[in-house]
A protein has these predicted regions:
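C-terminal beta-strand-rich structural cap/linker in extracellular carbohydrate-active enzymes
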Residues: 661-686, 747-784, 815-835
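Bacterial N-terminal signal peptides
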Residues: 7-15
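Extracellular polysaccharide-recognition and catalytic grooves
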Residues: 138-139, 150-172, 180-459
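Solvent-exposed beta-hairpin/edge-strand motifs
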Residues: 587-611, 732-747, 797, 802-807, ...
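Low-complexity, Ser/Thr/Pro/Gly-enriched N-terminal "stalk/linker" regions
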Residues: 21-144, 256
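Sec/Tat signal peptide C-region and signal peptidase I cleavage site
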Residues: 16-20
C-alpha cells in the first residue's frame, strides 16, 4: 500500500510547494481536458493546501458555551459578530474543515504545521459556536452581545438561511461525532429557519435587484433540513415550500402558462401553480447590485445544485434512501445556461463582465454552476467550461503562500470561505453524480456555436466572438457605466485586457480631465446597432465632464481580428482641458497573469510593471507579442497601476496628452482613430500600422473614417457621420494589395456616402483591383464576390488580388465590359456578364 501511494504523495507534494513568484497562467496553462478522477484529486489537494489559511484564521473562544462546550470561530472583518461577515465566514470555513476530515484523509498532503487533529478541532469548535449563537439555542452570545438567525416573520435576518445551510453541511460531515444533544441543537436551528420560510412571503422582482439568488438560498435551508430530518412530521410542508422557492428562483414570465407537472412521482402540481412572478428578464438575464452582474447571473444555479446535492448525499448516507427529491430545483437552469451564460463564456471558462465588477475579479465563481448543470443535467458544454474554470482556480491559489485563493481579497476571509465553499461543492457533486462517462464539447466548436453578434436588449449589451477574440460593450443604466473590453480567444492570454470601469466610462473611451469639472459621463445616444454575422457596429453619444464636452463614438467589432474605435469630441462650452486619457485598455500586471509587461513600439521596447506612468510617441504599440493597438494619434502612455478588484491593473492610453488646451464652445477637441488586435506579434502590429489609412482629410466636418487591415490581408472600411450636415465623397484609398472593392459602389475611384448623424457604414473586403478607374461593388456586401466594370479604354489588362485562406492570390485578366469576380476554392473565378 505504501509503495502504491508514494508516487501520488510525491505528486501532491510537488503541487503544494509551487511558489508564488512563478508565472502560473500566461504561457503555462492549456485547454486540455482533465479527467474527472484527476480533477477530484486536485480539488481535494487545493482544499488541503487551504488548510494553512484555515489554521491561521481560527480563533479560540475565551469561554465555552453555557453548557460547557469549548468553541471557537474563524475570523473575519467582523469576528464572532452576528452579521453576514461574521456568521457566514465561520459557517463556510467550519464546513470546509469538516469536509476535509471526512473526505480527504489518506488522499492529500496537509501543509507543514497543520494536522488532522487541528482540522478536527477547528471543525467541531466552530460548529459549536455556530449553533450556540443562533437565536433558537442561545447558548452563547455573539461579539455584540446578541444572536444570529431567523425565527419567524417577526424576528428574522436577511440571508441567515444561507449561513444555516453551511452549518447544516458542517454538521452532516461531523454527524457521527455529534451527540444526540448536539444534533438536537442543529435541528432547533434549522427548524427555526424553516419556520420563517413557511411564514414569509416569497418575493419576486427583476429590476435592478433580482430575488432569484435570495429565493435560491431559501430553498437551500429547506433542502438541508429535509435531508437531515426526512421523517419529521413537518417534512411535507418543508417540501412544498422548497418547491415554491425553487420554481421562483429562476422564475420567468412564461412560467405563468407552464402546465408541466413538476414531480410526477409525487403529485400533479404544475410550474404555473407555484409561480409567483418573474425574477428574470424576458431573455433570461437578471440584474443585481443594479446592473447585469454575471456572478449573480450564474450563482442561482449553484444554489439550486447545492440543494439537490444535500437531498442526495445526506439522505442516502444517513438513511439509505432519497425520500425527498424534486425536479423543481433544476427549473430553467438549462435555459439560463444556453440563453445567457454560454454567450458570455470565454476561453478560460470565465464569464465576460461587460460592466466590470464590484468584487474580486477572476474568481471563476461560476465553476459550481457549471458543475451543477454538468452533473445533474448532463450538459457537455457545462462540463467543458467547469474544467477550464477549475484549472484557473487551481493556478490562482498558487499565487499565495498560505493556500488562500487569491491575493488582495475584496472582503477578506469571507471571500476565502465563499471560494472554498465552491471548490468543495464541485467535488461533492462529482462524488454523487459522476461525469466520468461523459464526453465534453471542445471549446472551439462551442465558440463557433455562440460566435454571432448578439444584442442583449434588456441590458443594452452587445457582444460577439470571432476566432481571434471576444468583444463586448455595455450601456448599463443602473450604474451608469459605459465600457466594454476585448478578451483574446486564448486560455492563457485572455486576461491581458481586463474589465474596467471608472468615471462612468472605462475601456475604449477613457476620459478627459477638464479644469474645474468632474470626470463623468451622461448618455445622449445609448447605442445604435448594426449586426451582421459575428460582426457588430455601435454608435453612441456621451456628454462628459459635467456636460463640458460631447463625445460621439463608434466601435466596429469586425468579423476578423481588428476592433475599430472612432470618435468626434467637441467642446460644449469654453473650457481648459488639462489631460487626455483616451483609447483606454486596462492591462493586468498581476501575479495571476504577468507582473511585468514588455511594451514594443516604434523604435523602442520597455519592460514595466505599470507602477510609473511612461509616455511615448508611436503610431503603434504591442504588449508581450500578444495584444496590439495602432493609431494615427502618435501619443500614448502606459502605467497608473492600481488594485482593480484584486487584480493589479495598469492602463494603456492609446491617446494621451498632459498638455493644457484652451477650447472654445463648438471647437473640435479631437477625432480619434484606434484599432485593437488580439493574438498578434509586435512585428505584425507594426505592419498593421502601415496598413492603416485615415480618410479624415477627405471627409466633411463631423465625419471620421479609416481603412485598416487584418494580419491575413482582409481589409475593413469604417466611415462614421457623427455630426456632419453634408454627404461625403472620398477617393478609395490604395492599400498594399491595391484598391479595395467596397460594399458601396465605387465609380471612377470615388465613393459617395449619405449617412444620418450618429451612424456608420462599414464593410470588409478580400478583393482588390490595380486601377481606380474601374467601377466596382461587392455583391450584397459579400467580401468575396464583386462586380467589376471597365469604363475606360486606357488599357485592356487589369490585375485582381484576392485574400484566400492560403494567402494572397493574383489574376491578370483582359477586361471588356462587366465581369463577376468570385473567390472560389481558393482561386479567383471570373465570369463575363452579358448586358
Amino acid at each position: 500500500m505504501k509503495k502504491t501511494l508514494l508516487p501520488l504523495l510525491m505528486s501532491l507534494f510537488s503541487f503544494f510547494t509551487v511558489h508564488a513568484a512563478q508565472e502560473v497562467t500566461e504561457g503555462v496553462i492549456d485547454g486540455n481536458f482533465v479527467d474527472e478522477a484527476t480533477m477530484k484529486g486536485d480539488l481535494l489537494q487545493m482544499l488541503a493546501n487551504f488548510a494553512q489559511y484555515l489554521k491561521n484564521d481560527f480563533k479560540q473562544a475565551q469561554a465555552p458555551n453555557s453548557i460547557g462546550e469549548e468553541c471557537g470561530c474563524f475570523m473575519s472583518y467582523s469576528t464572532m459578530k452576528n452579521n453576514e461577515d461574521g456568521v457566514r465566514t465561520n459557517a463556510d470555513l467550519s464546513m470546509v474543515a469538516a469536509f476535509l476530515v471526512k473526505y480527504a484523509k489518506g488522499k492529500v498532503i496537509l501543509p507543514s504545521g497543520v494536522s488532522w487533529e487541528d482540522l478536527d478541532d477547528m471543525a467541531m469548535k466552530s460548529l459549536v459556536f455556530a449553533y450556540s449563537t443562533h437565536k433558537a439555542n442561545r447558548l452563547k452570545v455573539c461579539a455584540g452581545n446578541n444572536y444570529w438567525g431567523s425565527l419567524s416573520t417577526a424576528d428574522h435576518v436577511w440571508e441567515s438561511s444561507l449561513w444555516a445551510m453551511s452549518v447544516a453541511y458542517s454538521a452532516f460531515f461531523q454527524w457521527d461525532r455529534l451527540s444526540n444533544t448536539q444534533k438536537g441543537y442543529i435541528k432547533e436551528l434549522l427548524v427555526a429557519e424553516c419556520n420563517y420560510e413557511l411564514e414569509r412571503e416569497i418575493l419576486t422582482g427583476y429590476l435592478g435587484d433580482t430575488k432569484a439568488e435570495e429565493n435560491g438560498w431559501e430553498a437551500d435551508v429547506l433542502a438541508v433540513t429535509l435531508a437531515l430530518f426526512p421523517y419529521d412530521k413537518r417534512a411535507p410542508r418543508w417540501f412544498e415550500r422548497l418547491r415554491e422557492f425553487a420554481i421562483n428562483s429562476h422564475s420567468h414570465k412564461d412560467d405563468a402558462n407552464n402546465h408541466k407537472v413538476i414531480d410526477p412521482h409525487y403529485d400533479k402540481t404544475t410550474v404555473a401553480q407555484l409561480y409567483k412572478g418573474p425574477n428574470l428578464y424576458d431573455d433570461f438575464t437578471l440584474q443585481n447590485h443594479n446592473y447585469f452582474h454575471t456572478s449573480y447571473q450564474n450563482v442561482v444555479i449553484q444554489e439550486l445544485g447545492e440543494a439537490v446535492l444535500a437531498l442526495k448525499l445526506f439522505q442516502t448516507t444517513l438513511y439509505g434512501e432519497e425520500r425527498w427529491k424534486t425536479n423543481a430545483l433544476m427549473h430553467n437552469n438549462d435555459k439560463v445556461q444556453k440563453e445567457v451564460l454560454n454567450w458570455l463564456a470565454l476561453a478560460d471558462g470565465e464569464l465576460a463582465m461587460p460592466n466590470g465588477n464590484d468584487w474580486s475579479l477572476f474568481l471563476y465563481d461560476q465553476m459550481t454552476s457549471y458543475t451543477t448543470n454538468a452533473c445533474f443535467l448532463r450538459d457537455a458544454d457545462a462540463l467543458m467550461l467547469e474544467n477550464l474554470a477549475y484549472k484557473m482556480i487551481k493556478e490562482r491559489q498558487l499565487t499565495t503562500e498560505d493556500g488562500a485563493w487569491l491575493l488582495r481579497s475584496d472582503i477578506g476571509p469571507r471571500r476565502m470561505g465563499v471560494e472554498a465553499h465552491r471548490v468543495m461543492m464541485t467535488y461533492l457533486m462529482h462524488h454523487v453524480a459522476s461525469t466520468a462517462e461523459m464526453q465534453p464539447t471542445d471549446f472551439e466548436s462551442f465558440r463557433h456555436r455562440y460566435s454571432e453578434a448578439r444584442h442583449i436588449k434588456s441590458q443594452n449589451i452587445i457582444r460577439s466572438y470571432t476566432k481571434d477574440r471576444f468583444t463586448t460593450f455595455s450601456w448599463a443604466a443602473g450604474i451608469r457605466s459605459y465600457t466594454g473590453y476585448i478578451a483574446a480567444n486564448s486560455i492563457d492570454k485572455n486576461k491581458i485586457v481586463v474589465p474596467f470601469k471608472q468615471h462612468n466610462t472605462g475601456n475604449f473611451i477613457g476620459w478627459y480631465q477638464v479644469e474645474g469639472k468632474k470626470i463623468n459621463a451622461t448618455p445622449v445616444v445609448e447605442g445604435n446597432y448594426q449586426l451582421d454575422g459575428n460582426a457588430w457596429v455601435m454608435n453612441g453619444e456621451l456628454n462628459t465632464n459635467d456636460s463640458t464636452l460631447n463625445n460621439r463614438l463608434a466601435i466596429f467589432s469586425t468579423p476578423g481580428n481588428a476592433v475599430i474605435y472612432l470618435d468626434d469630441v467637441t467642446a460644449l462650452i469654453d473650457c481648459s482641458i488639462t489631460k487626455e486619457q483616451g483609447g483606454l485598455m486596462a492591462i493586468s500586471v498581476d501575479e495571476l497573469t504577468k507582473m511585468e509587461r514588455i511594451l514594443y513600439y516604434e523604435n523602442g521596447k520597455l519592460q514595466t510593471d505599470g507602477k510609473e506612468l511612461v509616455e511615448f510617441q508611436s503610431p503603434w504599440i504591442n504588449i508581450d507579442n500578444a495584444f496590439g493597438v495602432v493609431t494615427k494619434n502618435n501619443r500614448m502612455a502606459f502605467g497608473d497601476r492600481v488594485n482593480n478588484n484584486s487584480i493589479m491593473t495598469a492602463k494603456l492610453y492609446a491617446a494621451y496628452s498632459s498638455q493644457n488646451r484652451l477650447m472654445k464652445a463648438g471647437e473640435k477637441v479631437g477625432a480619434r482613430q484606434m484599432v485593437y488586435y488580439s493574438n498578434i506579434s509586435a512585428e505584425e502590429t507594426q505592419r498593421m500600422s502601415t496598413e492603416m489609412i485615415t480618410l479624415n482629410n477627405q471627409l466633411p466636418e463631423g465625419w471620421n473614417g479609416v481603412m485598416v487591415a487584418d494580419p491575413d490581408g482582409t481589409h475593413y472600411l469604417m466611415v462614421s457621420n457623427f455630426r456632419g450636415m453634408e454627404q461625403a465623397f472620398f477617393c478609395v484609398p490604395k492599400t498594399s494589395q491595391g484598391y479595395p472593392v467596397l460594399a458601396q459602389e465605387t465609380i471612377g475611384g470615388r465613393v459617395k456616402l449619405q449617412l444620418k448623424q450618429n451612424s456608420s457604414k462599414v464593410c470588409n473586403t478580400q478583393l482588390f483591383v490595380d486601377d481606380p478607374t474601374l467601377n466596382t461593388i461587392l455583391v450584397n456586401g459579400r467580401p468575396t464576390v464583386a462586380i467589376i466594370e471597365k469604363v475606360s479604354d486606357i488599357k485592356d489588362y487589369y490585375t485582381i488580388n484576392a485574400i484566400t485562406p492560403k494567402g494572397l492570390v493574383k489574376k491578370r485578366i483582359n477586361m471588356k465590359g462587366k465581369v463577376k469576380v468570385e473567390i472560389k476554392n481558393e482561386k479567383i473565378k471570373v465570369t463575363k456578364i452579358r448586358e
